[in-house]
């Protein structure tokens, strides 16, 4: 994978970011599900190169912008997108994508914000990724279908590796 987002949902997040960053220096490793400035600081100290949050927290966004840390806050309404626009952002996470109306909702929200690109997450999988990736306002997609917790728990890392390779190859095929 060229890029990985480690979620800050567990106590192992910081150490995971550190280990991945050291083992794979060519990989762009970031922290996701970041809810506070304190978590931003911990993630960056561990080696995170970008921050993603599930919602739009102006304090987190401002801290990241003030410290030159790439940040992608989550949005799912035009009001959220407007906040991002006013703060100078041009890429936003659309979350949760599928439960919030999917690609048709993104297209509706994106229409007045012609400068904005989106990274949808939440319900993206191998069956719907192509539709998202074909829309020119989608910068990237996020998904965890290739890293299911059941595979991690059972130690099926080769399967995870193969599923990840397949996903990356599919993105390259769709995007050219």
Task: List the predicted regions and their residue ranges.
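Generic hydrophobic/aromatic pocket-lining and core-packing "Φ" positions
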Residues: 17, 40, 61, 81, ...
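C-terminal helical cap(s) of enzyme catalytic domains, especially alpha/beta-barrels
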Residues: 63-69, 150-176
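Anionic-ligand binding region
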Residues: 78-92, 102-112
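Catalytic beta/alpha-barrel core
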Residues: 2-10, 27-35, 48-56, 70-77, ...
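Glycine-enriched alpha-helix->loop->beta-strand junction motifs that scaffold or abut catalytic
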Residues: 1-2, 23-27, 44-51, 66-72, ...
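Glycine-rich, proline-tolerant flexible connector loops at the mouths of alpha/beta enzymes
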Residues: 1-24, 145-155
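Catalytic cores of alpha/beta
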Residues: 36-46, 79-87, 124-139
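Glycine-rich phosphate-binding active-site loops on the catalytic face of alpha/beta enzymes
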Residues: 50, 54-60, 93-103, 137-159
